[in-house]
Amino acid sequence: MSIVRQSCDCCRVRRVKCDRNRPCDRCRQRNLRCTYLQPLRKRGPKSIGESNLERAAEIQMVTVNNNIMAAPVMYKKVPKKVIDQCLRLYHDQLYVIWPMLSYDDLYKLLEENYEDCSTYWFLVSLSAATLSDLHTKIEYKKGFFFAGEQLCNLCMSSRRFFDDLSNSDIFRIMTYYCLHRCYAQFADTRTSYRLSCEAIGLIKIAGFHREETYEFLPFGEQQLIRKVYYLLLMTERYYAVYIKCVTSLDTTISPPQPEIVTDSRLSLDSFLEVIKVFTVPGKYFYDALATNSVNGSYTEDSLKRIWNELHISSLDIEPYSYGYIDYLFSRHWVRTLAWKLVLNKKDMRMNFFSNTNATHIPVEIAKDMLQDTLLTPIDLYDVHGPVIPMKALEIANALVDVVSKYDHNMKLEAWNILCDVSKFVFSLKHCNHKMFQRFSTKCQSALIDLPISRPLRLNDDSKDEVDIIP
């Protein structure tokens, strides 16, 4: 076996052939000092150093392909340190809106089940949803950041790892819910709705839509699944109004139980109140809105019951918090939707419009909403994505529908309130051009001229098609 000999230092620098003698002929001819101090360079494939691995993984995670059908690529896992920071943010600011697990439970999963595939991807998707909702990034190393969209794309390109069609455990369900929240923030309604449908489908496959499934589960597991079930129920009912798809989940499942906590960030008070707002109307209420029809079971009395039960806001919720905003706007929104059903039923509409007080209901709802916005910091709205602008715009639409029914004095009051509501709606970050154009067209058709030259904080990143949200 021949022994590999290296070129001398001078020949290697000059990039000339060396006879490898000591001294070599080329150095001797040119009176150069011939040395062999530089270490022998190993030939063949190089070993993969840890630093190279880290750098390659960072590049892959930043430039991950959005196409989930692309060829399989092995990614280095998102560091525990990054996930842990996201879990803390979720605990501090978002748990009250969409509660799943407390930080202690999430940290335990991170430490003990980091290598478990479905658990790991749930934690990554939760991190993605958290960063997307809060519009922030996490710095991992100097100059290298993790953003919600990067983590979301990483999850979407790795779906075959966490959803292999062999199981429908709660972690897979929560993963799809978190991804749905990401795309809602990206204003991609089609993808957001599709991902929520994936989660709802897994709920049914697992049998979590039947109360008897919960009987033999530990209380903590029951509580978690009930929270996720109602998160999806409310999501489905919201989309029923705007995507025009009938609902499938019903209130046959008991909501989660109130929990006694010393940390207000873990309180379920606002979440339970929002559940109440969404479930005071029955399933048929949302199906009627989805199909633009009112069946015989929906009466004037049932609509009045909704207004009466949701007329006074709860005093159990911490004011001017993320959960408080979610509850208030959901309450105003559902009352307005009940009014919308009145417009779809001719005999009921005639009865209501013959009553001045009933006709004035949209004005009263709008007044309540504007009162709630007076002392509320505007940054509390952004975490909810396009939901708050859509709910507020529903109230503005109701005002347009009835403003022509008023006499001169009432019309002037309604017009002033409509202007204030419109200014508020179009000052929100997630209010996009299409929403503004549709509403402006409706106002023009009703011969209403709003003194608004342009939206104040338009979001031009909406991926919604023209017909996705009417």
From Swiss-Prot:
SMART domains: GAL4
DNA-binding region: 8-34
Subcellular location: Nucleus
Keyword match Ubl conjugation: no
A GO cellular component entry from the record: nucleus
Top-rank taxon, per record: Eukaryota
InterPro entries linked: Carb_Metab_Trans_Reg, Maltose_ferment_reg_DNA-bd, Zn2-C6_fun-type_DNA-bd_sf, Zn2Cys6_DnaBD
Gene3D superfamilies (UniProt xref): Zn(2)-C6 fungal-type DNA-binding domain (4.10.240.10)
Motif (Nuclear localization signal): 41-49
Gene Ontology biological process: regulation of DNA-templated transcription
Stored PROSITE patterns: ZN2_CY6_FUNGAL_1, ZN2_CY6_FUNGAL_2
Entry keywords, A to Z: DNA-binding, Metal-binding, Nucleus, Transcription, Transcription regulation, Zinc
Annotated GO MF terms: DNA-binding transcription factor activity, RNA polymerase II-specific; sequence-specific DNA binding; zinc ion binding
UniProt cross-references to Pfam families, sorted A to Z: Zn_clus
Function summary: May regulate the transcription of maltase and maltose permease genes.
PANTHER family in the record: GLUCOSE TRANSPORT TRANSCRIPTION REGULATOR RGT1-RELATED-RELATED (PTHR31668), MALTOSE FERMENTATION REGULATORY PROTEIN MAL13-RELATED (PTHR31668:SF18)
Recorded family membership: Belongs to the MAL13 family.
Protein name per the record: Maltose fermentation regulatory protein YPR196W
